[in-house]
Amino acid sequence: MAKRIIYNENARRALEKGMDILAESVAVTLGPKGRNVVLEKKFGAPQIVNDGVTIAKEIELEDHIENTGVALIRQAASKTNDAAGDGTTTATVLAHAMVKEGLRNVAAGANPIALKRGIDKATQFLVEKIAEHARPVEDSKAIAQVAAISAGNDEEVGRMIADAMDKVGKEGVISLEEAKSMTTELEVTEGMRFDKGYISPYFATDTERMEAVLDEPFVLVTDKKITLVQDLVPILEQVARAGKPLVIIAEDIEKEALATLVVNRLRGVLNVAAVKAPGFGDRSKAMLEDIAVLTAGQVIAEDAGLKLENAKLDMLGKARRITITKDHTTIVAEGNEKAVKARCEQIRRQIEETDSSYDKEKLQERLAKLAGGVAVIKVGAATETEMKDRKLRLEDAINATKAAVEEGIVPGGGTTLVHLAPELSNWAAEHLTGEELIGANIVERALSAPLRRIAENAGQNGAIIVERVKEKPFDVGYDAAKDEYVNMFDAGIVDPAKVTRSALQNAASIAGMVLTTECIIVDKPEPKENNPAGSGAGMGGDFDY
């Protein structure tokens, strides 16, 4: 494949063009008056979204170089999403503003390496300042505010997530399900989550989100390594006859047995997923027993005289729903309260009896997993399209809330970044010189971009609003929904400090990379051959082969 090689200014300009396209399509969703974006889907109804990272993932451009620019800025959004679960639009807008400002300086002859050093030092200073200004989240009112803002100013969702956190604790598991009705409701049921994901990505049922969701599955729990597929065949046949999915939780599954499961899954013979058992050694056995109690099944263990090839359906556990990602497995069980309570009592007694603080800690963890249960939010909506949008918003809200509990909250709506700009300016003037100072000033000018965009989406003049906010105290910002200046904490317009910090760090990282780019190598597009006349006669020419 021949390559195109582009140097210097041309390379950076082409990247910038791709970034402009992506940043604009994501920025329209920012703030309470942000608009929606409609995504065309190959199959099914179009999807209406208000979520930065989902939009960013959809954008592919024809020009390979511009597409590289899109991919770079998309990384800022998805890294922020991985770290904090929200703030993707802010990260995109910040990265774009920093790149724009930085390219101007590079074109004027500034040294990109010195600029990058300045950008990194400024970011480090801002991260410390954000931590200083963050307030811890104590009560459920603050949790509700964070969740409501993140779900697109939906107070009902905010209250629901605050309730869920009250019921399952701050470390508890909150899972989302699609409801059969139009209302969104909360339910707390028995369940647990452990830190092991699927053994093979081929088990994923939703390839876009890379997760396996199995409804009403059987659960096979065993402490042995499954090496031969023959051991599994009898139980697989029984499950296939019952017509339900199967989740296997085992110490490990060797290649041959795993390949058989994957092939059956892909051919649609049996909806199956396999997960490695959590923990190690004796602790692993104890956790497998917890899972068996939760799902009303048995651990098929050789030391209990049970063999895998002799297993019967009634030895398997049952769950309402199991969701498996690459790192976690969440089991939602039901109707087995008595056995779970008895098991919890047993663990409590062990905690009282043990002297080792390490064992105590591990037992506490097991108890929390079992006793905490799982809060299930059933997302309801009138149409499929609205349901998907609500589900994405709720997911953002849950992530934002967990981030807020971790690192505290700061004034939202782009306010924190705008108020930190003068502080950064003063610090940089004292501590930095030359081109490093210019690098810090690039960051300082970019800090007002999110607020400016929020104001513009609300139909106001962004530059004027930014200047007015700068004159006010730290906690006071612009409420775009009501078009007034308010104390952001009192008005409940708050962002998790972790989200603001991650957005800033990832934006600065991408900006530094783009500014220090001197050359781009991309594939040369192949010239399209014209079909000779008469080809495909009698066939529709529009088929994809």
Swiss-Prot record:
Main location: cytoplasm
Residues annotated as transmembrane: none
UniProt feature, compositional bias: Gly residues: 535-545
Residues reported in the UniProt entry to bind ATP: T29, L30, G31, P32, D86, G87, T88, T89, T90, G413, D479, A480, A481, D495
Annotated region described as Disordered, given as residue ranges: 525-545
Disulfide bond annotation, renumbered to this chain: none
Catalyzed reactions per annotation: ATP + H2O + a folded polypeptide = ADP + phosphate + an unfolded polypeptide
CDD domains assigned: GroEL (cd03344)
InterPro entries: Chaperonin_Cpn60_CS, Cpn60/GroEL, Cpn60/GroEL/TCP-1, GroEL-like_apical_dom_sf, GROEL-like_equatorial_sf, TCP-1-like_intermed_sf
GO process annotations (BP): protein refolding
Molecular function GO labels: ATP binding; ATP-dependent protein folding chaperone; isomerase activity; unfolded protein binding
An example Gene Ontology CC term for this record: cytoplasm
Keywords carried by this UniProt record: ATP-binding, Chaperone, Cytoplasm, Isomerase, Nucleotide-binding
Subcellular location: Cytoplasm
Enzyme Commission designation: 5.6.1.7
Family of the protein in this entry: Belongs to the chaperonin (HSP60) family.
Function, as annotated: Together with its co-chaperonin GroES, plays an essential role in assisting protein folding. The GroEL-GroES system forms a nano-cage that allows encapsulation of the non-native substrate proteins and provides a physical environment optimized to promote and accelerate protein folding.
Subunit-level organization: Forms a cylinder of 14 subunits composed of two heptameric rings stacked back-to-back. Interacts with the co-chaperonin GroES.
Annotated protein name in UniProt: Chaperonin GroEL 1
Gene giving rise to this polypeptide: groEL1
